[in-house]
Structure formats: structure tokens, C-alpha cells
């Protein structure tokens, strides 16, 4: 799968789940379960409830995603 196939969307973290998973509400109102990308995990970037994040979704499963950026 090419990297360009992923969909990036903005959202807000609503809930923290076990194993570094988060429930994120996207700007269009959809709810997504997302995990932290490897670079964010490696650099110890903390994500809290209420943070604005960028979520990367694949076109195959739009209910799961990867958090790739935390806005300030």
C-alpha cells in the first residue's frame, strides 16, 4: 500500500483507553479508536483527554486510526 492512500483528519481525544489507545472524535463527528504512532511513542509525547490531534486513517477500516501529531 502506498503512503498516499492514507486519509489525514483532525480530531479531539475524548477518552484514554488501555495500551496507549484513545477514543477520538473527528471534526466530521465520527468516532475512531486510535493508537500512537511509533515516532510519538519513541519521543515520549504524552496525549491527554481534550488534546487536538491529527489522525491517519486507511481507506480499508475507517473505525481505526493512528495518531501522528498532537497540536499545541
Curated annotation (Swiss-Prot):
Gene: infA
Keyword Protein biosynthesis: yes
Entry protein name: Translation initiation factor IF-1
Intracellular or extracellular location(s): Cytoplasm
Domain S1-like: start-end pairs: 1-72
Spans through the membrane: none
PROSITE patterns recorded: S1_IF1_TYPE
Pfam families xrefs: eIF-1a
Amino acid at each position: 500500500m502506498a503512503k498516499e492512500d492514507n486519509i489525514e483528519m483532525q480530531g479531539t481525544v475524548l477518552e484514554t483507553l488501555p495500551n496507549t489507545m484513545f477514543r477520538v472524535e473527528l471534526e466530521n463527528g465520527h468516532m475512531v479508536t486510535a493508537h500512537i504512532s511509533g515516532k510519538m511513542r519513541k519521543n515520549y509525547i504524552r496525549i491527554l483527554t481534550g488534546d487536538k490531534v491529527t489522525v491517519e486513517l486507511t481507506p480499508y477500516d475507517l473505525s481505526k486510526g493512528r495518531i501522528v501529531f498532537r497540536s499545541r
